From Swiss-Prot:
DNA-dependent RNA polymerase catalyzes the transcription of DNA into RNA using the four ribonucleoside triphosphates as substrates. One of its GO terms (cellular component) is cytoplasm. It comes from Nocardioides sp. (strain ATCC BAA-499 / JS614). Its EC number is 2.7.7.6. GO terms for molecular function: DNA binding; DNA-directed RNA polymerase activity; protein dimerization activity. This is DNA-directed RNA polymerase subunit alpha.
Protein backbone atom coordinates (compact mmCIF):
# COMPACT_ATOMS: atom_id res chain seq x y z
CA UNK A 1 0.00 0.00 0.00
CA UNK A 2 1.34 3.41 -0.98
CA UNK A 3 0.51 6.16 1.49
CA UNK A 4 0.90 9.82 0.53
CA UNK A 5 1.03 12.70 2.98
CA UNK A 6 -2.38 14.31 3.36
CA UNK A 7 -2.37 17.76 1.71
CA UNK A 8 -3.68 20.79 3.55
CA UNK A 9 -6.12 23.31 2.10
CA UNK A 10 -5.94 26.92 3.28
CA UNK A 11 -7.98 29.95 2.23
CA UNK A 12 -6.69 33.50 1.82
CA UNK A 13 -9.58 35.96 1.52
CA UNK A 14 -8.90 38.71 -1.04
CA UNK A 15 -12.34 40.32 -0.67
CA UNK A 16 -15.88 39.21 0.13
CA UNK A 17 -16.34 37.32 -3.13
CA UNK A 18 -12.77 36.44 -4.07
CA UNK A 19 -10.48 33.98 -2.32
CA UNK A 20 -7.20 32.26 -3.00
CA UNK A 21 -6.96 28.58 -2.03
CA UNK A 22 -3.65 26.78 -1.51
CA UNK A 23 -3.47 22.97 -1.57
CA UNK A 24 -0.12 21.41 -0.65
CA UNK A 25 1.83 19.19 -0.75
CA UNK A 26 0.59 17.17 -3.72
CA UNK A 27 2.38 14.28 -5.35
CA UNK A 28 4.33 15.39 -8.46
CA UNK A 29 1.95 16.00 -11.37
CA UNK A 30 -1.21 16.07 -9.30
CA UNK A 31 -1.20 19.87 -9.08
CA UNK A 32 -2.19 20.21 -12.74
CA UNK A 33 -4.55 17.23 -12.57
CA UNK A 34 -6.47 18.66 -9.63
CA UNK A 35 -6.20 22.30 -10.71
CA UNK A 36 -7.58 21.74 -14.20
CA UNK A 37 -10.41 19.52 -12.92
CA UNK A 38 -11.46 22.04 -10.28
CA UNK A 39 -11.28 24.99 -12.67
CA UNK A 40 -13.44 23.37 -15.34
CA UNK A 41 -15.96 22.18 -12.77
CA UNK A 42 -16.14 25.58 -11.08
CA UNK A 43 -16.78 27.37 -14.36
CA UNK A 44 -19.32 24.95 -15.80
CA UNK A 45 -21.05 22.87 -13.17
CA UNK A 46 -21.84 24.91 -10.06
CA UNK A 47 -25.63 25.20 -9.68
CA UNK A 48 -27.17 28.67 -9.70
CA UNK A 49 -30.29 30.63 -10.58
CA UNK A 50 -31.13 33.03 -13.40
CA UNK A 51 -33.98 34.81 -15.15
CA UNK A 52 -35.22 32.67 -18.06
CA UNK A 53 -38.06 34.82 -19.42
CA UNK A 54 -39.81 38.15 -18.90
CA UNK A 55 -43.19 39.64 -19.71
CA UNK A 56 -43.74 43.42 -19.87
CA UNK A 57 -47.19 44.97 -19.87
CA UNK A 58 -48.27 46.17 -23.34
CA UNK A 59 -45.16 44.71 -25.01
CA UNK A 60 -45.39 41.87 -27.52
CA UNK A 61 -41.74 41.32 -28.53
CA UNK A 62 -38.17 42.37 -27.73
CA UNK A 63 -37.96 44.87 -30.60
CA UNK A 64 -40.64 47.11 -29.10
CA UNK A 65 -40.33 50.41 -27.27
CA UNK A 66 -42.07 51.23 -24.01
CA UNK A 67 -43.87 54.54 -23.61
CA UNK A 68 -42.24 56.67 -20.92
CA UNK A 69 -39.14 54.43 -20.73
CA UNK A 70 -35.83 55.71 -22.11
CA UNK A 71 -34.46 52.26 -22.95
CA UNK A 72 -36.06 49.98 -25.51
CA UNK A 73 -36.94 46.40 -24.63
CA UNK A 74 -33.66 45.01 -25.99
CA UNK A 75 -31.67 47.31 -23.67
CA UNK A 76 -33.84 46.34 -20.71
CA UNK A 77 -33.18 42.66 -21.42
CA UNK A 78 -29.42 43.33 -21.67
CA UNK A 79 -29.51 45.08 -18.30
CA UNK A 80 -31.40 42.17 -16.74
CA UNK A 81 -28.59 39.81 -17.73
CA UNK A 82 -26.57 41.42 -14.95
CA UNK A 83 -29.15 40.50 -12.32
CA UNK A 84 -27.77 38.17 -9.63
CA UNK A 85 -30.37 36.00 -7.94
CA UNK A 86 -30.49 32.82 -5.89
CA UNK A 87 -33.44 30.47 -5.50
CA UNK A 88 -34.23 27.64 -3.13
CA UNK A 89 -36.97 26.31 -5.42
CA UNK A 90 -36.52 23.47 -7.88
CA UNK A 91 -39.49 24.70 -9.89
CA UNK A 92 -39.71 28.03 -11.81
CA UNK A 93 -40.88 30.98 -9.70
CA UNK A 94 -42.06 34.45 -10.72
CA UNK A 95 -40.83 37.83 -9.48
CA UNK A 96 -42.69 41.09 -10.09
CA UNK A 97 -41.47 44.60 -10.84
CA UNK A 98 -43.81 47.60 -10.71
CA UNK A 99 -42.52 51.17 -10.90
CA UNK A 100 -43.98 54.50 -12.05
CA UNK A 101 -42.84 58.12 -12.05
CA UNK A 102 -39.57 59.75 -13.05
CA UNK A 103 -36.34 58.05 -11.98
CA UNK A 104 -34.25 54.94 -12.32
CA UNK A 105 -35.68 51.45 -12.10
CA UNK A 106 -33.28 49.20 -10.18
CA UNK A 107 -33.23 45.61 -8.99
CA UNK A 108 -34.34 46.91 -5.59
CA UNK A 109 -37.76 47.53 -7.15
CA UNK A 110 -38.19 43.79 -7.82
CA UNK A 111 -40.44 41.91 -5.39
CA UNK A 112 -39.10 38.34 -5.10
CA UNK A 113 -41.18 35.57 -3.52
CA UNK A 114 -40.07 33.66 -0.43
CA UNK A 115 -36.98 31.56 -1.10
CA UNK A 116 -35.68 33.90 -3.82
CA UNK A 117 -33.13 36.65 -3.17
CA UNK A 118 -31.81 39.50 -5.34
CA UNK A 119 -28.13 40.04 -4.50
CA UNK A 120 -27.35 43.23 -6.46
CA UNK A 121 -30.24 45.63 -5.75
CA UNK A 122 -28.28 48.60 -7.14
CA UNK A 123 -28.38 47.19 -10.69
CA UNK A 124 -29.99 49.72 -13.04
CA UNK A 125 -32.66 48.20 -15.28
CA UNK A 126 -34.33 51.20 -16.96
CA UNK A 127 -35.02 54.95 -16.74
CA UNK A 128 -38.56 56.34 -16.48
CA UNK A 129 -39.90 59.77 -17.45
CA UNK A 130 -42.50 61.69 -15.44
CA UNK A 131 -45.36 59.70 -16.93
CA UNK A 132 -43.35 56.50 -17.33
CA UNK A 133 -44.59 53.19 -15.98
CA UNK A 134 -42.98 49.76 -16.03
CA UNK A 135 -44.67 46.54 -14.97
CA UNK A 136 -42.86 43.26 -15.54
CA UNK A 137 -42.91 39.58 -14.65
CA UNK A 138 -39.58 37.76 -14.37
CA UNK A 139 -39.40 33.96 -14.26
CA UNK A 140 -36.46 32.56 -12.26
CA UNK A 141 -35.21 28.99 -12.58
CA UNK A 142 -32.31 26.96 -11.21
CA UNK A 143 -29.75 25.37 -13.50
CA UNK A 144 -26.07 25.34 -14.38
CA UNK A 145 -23.86 26.71 -17.12
CA UNK A 146 -25.30 28.82 -19.95
CA UNK A 147 -28.65 28.40 -21.70
CA UNK A 148 -29.56 30.54 -24.72
CA UNK A 149 -32.85 32.36 -25.20
CA UNK A 150 -33.71 29.95 -28.03
CA UNK A 151 -33.39 27.00 -25.62
CA UNK A 152 -35.47 28.83 -23.02
CA UNK A 153 -38.34 29.30 -25.48
CA UNK A 154 -41.00 26.77 -24.59
CA UNK A 155 -43.33 25.12 -27.07
CA UNK A 156 -46.36 26.68 -25.35
CA UNK A 157 -44.81 30.12 -24.86
CA UNK A 158 -47.62 32.64 -24.27
CA UNK A 159 -47.88 35.80 -26.36
CA UNK A 160 -45.74 38.59 -24.94
CA UNK A 161 -43.46 36.31 -22.91
CA UNK A 162 -39.88 36.83 -24.06
CA UNK A 163 -37.21 34.20 -23.34
CA UNK A 164 -33.78 35.55 -22.38
CA UNK A 165 -30.26 34.13 -22.20
CA UNK A 166 -29.58 32.54 -18.81
CA UNK A 167 -26.17 32.50 -17.16
CA UNK A 168 -26.63 30.19 -14.19
CA UNK A 169 -23.01 29.90 -13.11
CA UNK A 170 -22.33 31.89 -9.91
CA UNK A 171 -18.58 31.72 -10.57
CA UNK A 172 -17.07 34.64 -12.50
CA UNK A 173 -13.41 33.74 -12.82
CA UNK A 174 -11.04 30.91 -11.90
CA UNK A 175 -7.28 30.83 -12.38
CA UNK A 176 -4.70 28.45 -11.00
CA UNK A 177 -0.97 27.93 -10.92
CA UNK A 178 1.28 25.12 -9.76
CA UNK A 179 4.48 25.80 -7.85
CA UNK A 180 7.15 23.53 -6.41
CA UNK A 181 7.13 22.91 -2.69
CA UNK A 182 9.42 21.04 -0.33
CA UNK A 183 8.67 18.14 2.00
CA UNK A 184 11.68 17.22 4.12
CA UNK A 185 14.47 16.49 1.60
CA UNK A 186 12.26 16.28 -1.50
CA UNK A 187 11.63 19.44 -3.52
CA UNK A 188 9.49 18.04 -6.35
CA UNK A 189 6.08 18.16 -4.67
CA UNK A 190 3.33 20.36 -6.15
CA UNK A 191 1.71 23.38 -4.55
CA UNK A 192 -1.63 24.28 -6.16
CA UNK A 193 -2.89 27.87 -5.89
CA UNK A 194 -6.48 28.47 -7.09
CA UNK A 195 -7.94 31.98 -7.35
CA UNK A 196 -11.76 31.99 -7.34
CA UNK A 197 -14.03 34.99 -7.90
CA UNK A 198 -17.79 34.59 -7.56
CA UNK A 199 -21.04 36.51 -7.83
CA UNK A 200 -22.63 37.74 -4.57
CA UNK A 201 -24.96 34.71 -4.60
CA UNK A 202 -22.26 32.31 -3.36
CA UNK A 203 -19.01 32.42 -1.39
CA UNK A 204 -15.81 31.16 -3.03
CA UNK A 205 -15.34 28.48 -0.34
CA UNK A 206 -18.85 27.15 -1.00
CA UNK A 207 -18.14 27.05 -4.74
CA UNK A 208 -14.94 25.05 -4.13
CA UNK A 209 -16.85 22.67 -1.84
CA UNK A 210 -19.55 22.19 -4.50
CA UNK A 211 -16.94 21.46 -7.18
CA UNK A 212 -15.22 18.96 -4.90
CA UNK A 213 -18.50 17.15 -4.21
CA UNK A 214 -19.23 16.91 -7.94
CA UNK A 215 -15.79 15.51 -8.74
CA UNK A 216 -15.96 12.96 -5.92
CA UNK A 217 -19.31 11.72 -7.25
CA UNK A 218 -17.95 11.41 -10.80
CA UNK A 219 -14.67 9.74 -9.88
CA UNK A 220 -16.63 7.37 -7.66
CA UNK A 221 -18.03 5.82 -10.84
CA UNK A 222 -14.56 4.62 -11.80
CA UNK A 223 -13.90 3.27 -8.32
CA UNK A 224 -17.08 1.20 -8.44
CA UNK A 225 -15.48 -0.99 -11.11
CA UNK A 226 -13.30 -2.51 -8.40
CA UNK A 227 -13.58 -1.16 -4.87
CA UNK A 228 -10.57 -3.24 -3.82
CA UNK A 229 -8.26 -1.85 -6.52
CA UNK A 230 -4.90 -0.62 -5.22
CA UNK A 231 -4.15 3.09 -5.33
CA UNK A 232 -2.43 5.82 -3.34
CA UNK A 233 -3.98 6.17 0.09
CA UNK A 234 -3.99 9.60 1.70
CA UNK A 235 -2.57 9.58 5.21
CA UNK A 236 -4.23 11.20 8.22
CA UNK A 237 -4.08 14.96 8.57
CA UNK A 238 -1.59 16.47 11.05
CA UNK A 239 -4.58 17.79 13.02
CA UNK A 240 -6.05 14.29 13.36
CA UNK A 241 -2.69 12.87 14.40
CA UNK A 242 -2.25 15.59 17.04
CA UNK A 243 -5.77 15.05 18.36
CA UNK A 244 -5.17 11.30 18.66
CA UNK A 245 -1.94 11.99 20.56
CA UNK A 246 -3.69 14.44 22.88
CA UNK A 247 -6.51 12.01 23.66
CA UNK A 248 -4.00 9.27 24.50
CA UNK A 249 -2.04 11.56 26.83
CA UNK A 250 -1.94 10.25 30.44
CA UNK A 251 -3.79 12.46 32.92
CA UNK A 252 -0.65 12.64 35.06
CA UNK A 253 1.04 14.61 32.24
CA UNK A 254 -1.47 17.43 32.70
CA UNK A 255 0.45 18.42 35.83
CA UNK A 256 -2.65 18.70 37.96
CA UNK A 257 -2.46 19.18 41.70
CA UNK A 258 -2.03 15.98 43.68
CA UNK A 259 -5.60 16.12 45.02
CA UNK A 260 -7.16 16.44 41.55
CA UNK A 261 -4.94 13.78 40.03
CA UNK A 262 -5.60 11.27 42.82
CA UNK A 263 -9.37 11.79 42.55
CA UNK A 264 -9.31 11.13 38.80
CA UNK A 265 -7.04 8.11 39.18
CA UNK A 266 -9.28 6.64 41.87
CA UNK A 267 -12.26 7.09 39.50
CA UNK A 268 -10.44 5.15 36.75
CA UNK A 269 -9.80 8.17 34.52
CA UNK A 270 -6.30 7.62 33.15
CA UNK A 271 -6.18 9.47 29.79
CA UNK A 272 -7.30 12.84 28.42
CA UNK A 273 -9.72 11.01 26.11
CA UNK A 274 -11.42 9.41 29.11
CA UNK A 275 -11.47 12.77 30.88
CA UNK A 276 -13.22 14.76 28.12
CA UNK A 277 -15.90 12.07 27.84
CA UNK A 278 -17.09 13.12 31.30
CA UNK A 279 -19.34 16.08 32.07
CA UNK A 280 -18.74 18.60 34.84
CA UNK A 281 -21.46 16.95 36.91
CA UNK A 282 -19.77 13.56 36.45
CA UNK A 283 -16.58 14.98 37.94
CA UNK A 284 -18.40 16.79 40.75
CA UNK A 285 -19.88 13.44 41.77
CA UNK A 286 -16.34 12.21 42.54
CA UNK A 287 -15.59 12.39 46.26
CA UNK A 288 -13.42 15.42 47.19
CA UNK A 289 -13.48 16.73 43.60
CA UNK A 290 -14.97 20.22 43.92
CA UNK A 291 -15.58 23.31 41.81
CA UNK A 292 -11.97 24.48 42.02
CA UNK A 293 -10.75 21.12 40.76
CA UNK A 294 -13.21 21.44 37.87
CA UNK A 295 -11.77 24.85 36.97
CA UNK A 296 -8.25 23.48 37.13
CA UNK A 297 -9.10 20.61 34.77
CA UNK A 298 -10.98 22.92 32.39
CA UNK A 299 -8.04 25.32 32.28
CA UNK A 300 -5.62 22.54 31.37
CA UNK A 301 -7.96 21.22 28.67
CA UNK A 302 -8.49 24.68 27.15
CA UNK A 303 -4.73 24.99 26.72
CA UNK A 304 -4.93 21.87 24.53
CA UNK A 305 -7.97 23.12 22.60
CA UNK A 306 -10.25 20.60 24.34
CA UNK A 307 -13.11 20.75 26.83
CA UNK A 308 -15.32 18.60 29.01
CA UNK A 309 -18.43 17.07 27.46
CA UNK A 310 -20.85 19.81 28.48
CA UNK A 311 -18.57 22.79 29.18
CA UNK A 312 -20.10 26.12 28.21
CA UNK A 313 -18.06 28.36 25.88
CA UNK A 314 -16.29 31.45 27.19
CA UNK A 315 -14.30 29.83 30.04
CA UNK A 316 -11.28 31.99 30.98
CA UNK A 317 -8.38 29.65 31.87
CA UNK A 318 -6.05 32.48 32.91
CA UNK A 319 -8.42 33.72 35.58
CA UNK A 320 -8.90 30.18 36.89
CA UNK A 321 -5.20 29.34 36.97
CA UNK A 322 -4.36 32.65 38.67
CA UNK A 323 -6.42 31.53 41.64
CA UNK A 324 -4.21 28.47 42.16
CA UNK A 325 -0.95 30.22 42.87
CA UNK A 326 2.07 27.92 42.99
CA UNK A 327 1.97 24.27 41.97
CA UNK A 328 2.36 22.90 45.51
CA UNK A 329 -0.53 21.14 47.16
CA UNK A 330 -1.19 23.96 49.66
CA UNK A 331 -1.85 26.40 46.83
CA UNK A 332 -4.96 24.50 45.79
CA UNK A 333 -7.32 23.93 48.68
CA UNK A 334 -10.79 22.49 48.18
CA UNK A 335 -13.76 23.35 50.31
CA UNK A 336 -14.32 19.64 50.86
CA UNK A 337 -12.23 17.70 53.35
CA UNK A 338 -10.92 14.15 53.20
Amino acid sequence: MLIAQRPTLSEETVDEFRSRFVIEPLEPGFGYTLGNSLRRTLLSSIPGASVTSIKIDNVLHEFSTIEGVKEDVTEVILNLKGLVVSSEHDEPVTMYLRKSGAGDVTAADIAPPAGVEVHNPDLKIATLSDKGKLEMELVVERGRGYVSAVQNKGADNEIGRMPVDSIYSPVLKVTYKVEATRVEQRTDFDKLVIDVETKPSIRPRDAIASAGKTLVELFGLARELNVEAEGIDIGPSPVDEQLAADLALPVEDLQLTVRSYNCLKREGIHTVGELISRSEQDLLDIRNFGAKSIDEVKAKLVEMGLSLKDSAPGFDPHAALAAYGDDDDDAFVEDEQY
